[in-house]
Amino acid sequence: KIAARATPDAFIIDKGPYCDDCGECVSVCPTDAINLKEQPRMETIEVGAIILALGFKVYDSDGLEELGHGRYPNVVEAMQYERLASRSGPTEGMITRPSDGKQPSSIAWLQCIGSRDQDNPFCSSICCMYATKEAILAKQRLGKDVDCSVFIMDERAFNKEYSAYFTKARDQHEIEYNYCRVSEIREDPQSGDLLVQFATPGGELHQEKFEMVVLATGLQPPESARYLADNLGIELNQYGFCKTDKFTPLQTTREGVYVCGAFSAPK
């Protein structure tokens, strides 16, 4: 197996750099299941229904030059932060700055990156919650003294328990929420720290320094959505996700073809 937790739970022949095409695997296979001369072929099968689970594509923030991702090493996207926080990640779960390996004493999360703007007017629905989770995780890993600030337009908690999670983050973990949208990030070239510029609720321009910034990137339709829609004869909505009805959220515009997960809408 290439991956221990692969799905489906099956073995494959990995013709990587260590395979010399000796063919010994054919002779030792007890069920004669290996045919090294097998060629790809097209098959037609009849099914009663089709379920589309294409998932989503994460927004690429490199095009937003004012936020510095790709230029400033300590500006990371949420997926990169998740890898740093993962016990199986490159830092074994220890959250460190990419520039110098130092544990940050202050982290800012910027919300709605690639969502609720002129290009992508829809809400990605998950960013508020995962940013709050990541901020709490920073407190747990780095200590309660680390400064965690979330720059957010408004709280979008799409669940009864989610509102309580926000309250817990604010009251118990002392996560700070700033209701604004960041206009620019600049780097201090000596320290690698980041200067975050934003407007206060009173309209005053303010600047605050953080040692690390996390961009809460939104969700976009998968790249294969249009190709699949054309081949299956289904419609997409104005944002490029699968078109459904509010009262039948699993049904596409073609009978017998259903959709699940984030392909129907960001979730």
Task: Name the predicted role of every residue range.
Residues 1-267:
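Residues forming the flavin
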